[in-house]
Amino acid sequence: MTPEILPIEDYDDQLAEKTERLRGMMAPFNAPEPAVFRSPVSHYRMRAEFRIWHDGDELYHIMFDQQTKQRIRVDRFPAASELINRLMPEMLAAIQPDPVLRRKLFQIDYLSTLSGEVIVSLLYHRALNEEWQEHARALRDSLTAQGFNLQLIGRATKTKICLDRDYVDECLPVAGRNMIYRQVENSFTQPNAAVNIQMLEWALDATAGSKGDLLELYCGNGNFSLALARNFERVLATEIAKPSVAAAQYNIAANQIENVQIIRMAAEEFTQAMQGVRQFNRLQGIDLTSYQCETIFVDPPRSGLDDETVKLVQAYPRILYISCNPETLSNNLKTLSETHDIRRLALFDQFPYTHHMECGVLLEKRQ
């Protein structure tokens, strides 16, 4: 595979290999047959990052080969959304003849949405001044006139210049409802929107008919908690990153959801609060004991859950666990399977043509 050519004819084989690998990893835990959710075979990534190569008067996007570290010129990138592919040549064509915009530009990041909005971040090895802002505004206006719904950001050491705003608003159709999600530049968002929709709908189906409240750790911008709110009395969700918490609060209001409470704290801190080990000012006005959480939802980073959080999670009757690293999931399941059984297993092909897998398990406590 090269950045400009996807092995589309191999898609089914690579998905079958992942499915078999997941079966093998989950076999020790008596997991059921996985439900498998396919990705679009091209234009599935909603974001992309490119280094910029200066070659005389020429300017082009490059990536580096992971094995050889050689640079590869990238004029089109079929893994990325069609919107990013349309924008890439127009962006370079506008920057190339402008010495103010191109000087010491070393990277361009794109974040696009199914709703048609896109953020472009230009990264520089130099200070950005008022002259840069004037030229950047002209670039933004030129691309807007070409029909792009675009936000432009300049970044340099300890500098972030936002011409208008640093976010886009995504709209995802989830089980009959359009969900609005504010996505902030340089914050985590699910890279594959089509697969994200399938993940949300699987989680909704897995928790249908739930009783009581939902606790979510690592909620990000509220991707799962807002979609799942319709299945629960109330949702209590934690997140540590300030921009993600702010986006989640906006998303709650934008979707007119009234039963979700977001608190800014790490999963480890929340564990201490639940166990009564520490008190936190951030929890003033929130009565943790009033929540009857029968279900806990976790979507941890690649490192998985730490030992203390595994113990916290294990106390809940139902656990919904989304993992971007089945190896750390397997490690956590060694403990969780002592008390819980896997009722559902899913493979989400979030990262086609790579060895990476995203998966989901629903666990229920044995009686």
Curated annotation (Swiss-Prot):
Q: Could you name the Gene Ontology cellular component terms for this entry?
A: cytosol
GO molecular function list = rRNA binding; tRNA (uracil(54)-C5)-methyltransferase activity, S-adenosyl methionine-dependent; tRNA binding
InterPro entries listed in its UniProt record: MeTrfase_TrmA_AS, MeTrfase_TrmA_CS, SAM-dependent_MTases_sf, TrmA_MeTrfase, U5_MeTrfase_fam
Which residues are listed for S-adenosyl-L-methionine binding in this entry? 190, 218, 223, 239, 299
How would you classify this enzyme at the top EC level? transferase
Pfam families, alphabetized: tRNA_U5-meth_tr (PF05958)
> Could you tell me what reaction this enzyme catalyses?
uridine(54) in tRNA + S-adenosyl-L-methionine = 5-methyluridine(54) in tRNA + S-adenosyl-L-homocysteine + H(+); uridine(341) in tmRNA + S-adenosyl-L-methionine = 5-methyluridine(341) in tmRNA + S-adenosyl-L-homocysteine + H(+)
Protein task: Dual-specificity methyltransferase that catalyzes the formation of 5-methyluridine at position 54 (m5U54) in all tRNAs, and that of position 341 (m5U341) in tmRNA (transfer-mRNA).
Q: What is the protein name for this chain?
A: tRNA/tmRNA (uracil-C(5))-methyltransferase
State the organism named in the record: Pectobacterium atrosepticum (strain SCRI 1043 / ATCC BAA-672) (Erwinia carotovora subsp. atroseptica)
